[in-house]
């Protein structure tokens, strides 16, 4: 079946921080050289930010580089970190507070902001559209298209209106092909097209195996007297230590008397009976956490896969006609345990030679 096609200079798959920042930077560079470049972003969510789930504490260095006047544009970076606390949870009742004096410098969050990464993406989407980037929410890229020479031609969206047996219903609409000179894949952790490209082009043959975790997060409304806007709490140990498993936890005091609380469980745990969800529920009952949640109300929750292998697990990120970025590739500032601040940071080429091309 012949499908309709659209032509662009660059097609970006995924409207997360990496994809949106790439689109904005491309438009900025084109404007500096008085050139026109057509950029399209495909986003599977119903809107930009719909599939974003993160704590998050964000270093504004990337935003300073991408949009230097972000403070004048009603950005969602409005809650600066006021202080840090770090704990090692020893038992279900006890915890040892790590003195800030001995905390590694990358773990200090002075100058960072507590944000909703979904709101950050929505705001970045507005900045991208102001630069005439075309964003198509509600359309998932279902396959990669190739030229005869094996280079990437673009992507195609999935068909709509097929029955369970694959037959076409009356409402059937075929997918659309989006052709580009360059296609950027920023689908997030374990994106299905990115996995296909890594396998097809053997991008990870010189890399260490990638590591993954699952992150569970809840957003709570808490009483005003328990809220300390800007407080960042990190920790490790119990309850995962009981099963010799590893991971970490966090609690961030955002604005409007809300806190984000979460547990991250490394997916190399050996206990087949371990339930990350149940461990999260236990964690919330620890006195160091429960004291903030008492009398509060959970307003949203979610979970997502996290890539955490770091520099040695990065695959090669460029292929003929395409590029892997963000969590699709596994970029991570391992020292800070952060990924979202990398999307416009200086070229990681300095860190790993030719394995990583310059970031957009």
Pin down the residues of each PLM region.
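A short, basic/flexible loop-to-alpha-helix module at the beginning of a structural domain
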Residues: 1-6, 168, 172
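N-terminal Rossmann-like FAD-binding beta1-loop-alpha1 element of flavoenzymes
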Residues: 10-35
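Glycine-rich FAD pyrophosphate-binding loop
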Residues: 29-50
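N-terminal FAD cofactor-binding segment of flavoenzymes
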Residues: 45-91
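Short beta-strand to alpha-helix junction loop
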Residues: 107-126, 271-274
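Predominantly flavin-linked oxidoreductase catalytic cores and closely associated redox partners
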Residues: 131-286
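FAD/FMN-dependent oxidoreductases across multiple families
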Residues: 245, 271-272, 276-341
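Conserved small/polar residues in nucleotide/adenosyl-binding loops
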Residues: 343-350
């Amino acid at each position: 079946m012949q499908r309709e096609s659209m032509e662009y200079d660059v097609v970006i798959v995924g409207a997360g921080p990496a994809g949106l920042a790439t689109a904005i930077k491309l438009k900025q560079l084109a404007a500096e050289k008085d050139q026109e470049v057509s950029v399209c972003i495909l986003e599977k969510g119903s809107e930009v930010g719909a599939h974003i789930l993160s704590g998050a504490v964000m270093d504004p260095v990337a935003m300073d580089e991408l949009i230097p006047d972000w403070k004048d544009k009603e950005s969602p970076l409005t809650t600066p970190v006021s202080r840090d606390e770090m704990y090692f949870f020893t038992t279900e009742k006890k915890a040892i507070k790590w003195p800030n004096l001995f905390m590694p410098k990358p773990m200090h969050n002075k100058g960072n902001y507590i944000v909703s990464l979904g709101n950050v993406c929505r705001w970045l989407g507005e900045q991208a559209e102001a630069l005439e980037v075309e964003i198509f929410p509600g359309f998932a890229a279902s396959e990669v298209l190739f030229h005869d020479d094996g280079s990437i031609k673009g992507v195609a969206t999935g068909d709509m209106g097929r029955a369970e047996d694959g037959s076409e219903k009356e409402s059937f609409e075929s997918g659309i092909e989006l052709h580009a000179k360059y296609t950027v894949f920023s689908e997030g952790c374990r994106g299905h097209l990115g996995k296909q490209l890594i396998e097809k082009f053997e991008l990870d043959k010189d890399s260490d195996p990638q590591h993954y975790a699952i992150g569970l997060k809840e957003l709570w409304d808490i009483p005003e007297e328990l809220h300390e806007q800007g407080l960042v709490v990190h920790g490790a140990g119990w309850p995962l230590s009981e099963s010799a498993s590893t991971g970490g936890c966090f609690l961030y005091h955002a604005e409007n008397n809300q806190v984000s609380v979460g547990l991250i469980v490394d997916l190399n745990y050996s206990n087949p009976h371990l339930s990350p969800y149940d461990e999260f529920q236990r964690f919330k009952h620890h006195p160091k956490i429960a004291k903030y949640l008492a009398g509060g109300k959970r307003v949203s929750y979610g979970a997502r896969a996290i890539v955490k292998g770091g520099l040695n697990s990065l695959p090669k990120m460029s292929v003929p006609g395409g590029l892997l970025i963000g969590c699709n590739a596994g970029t991570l500032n391992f020292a800070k345990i952060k990924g979202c601040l990398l999307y416009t940071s200086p070229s990681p080429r300095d860190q790993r030679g030719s394995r990583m091309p310059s970031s957009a």
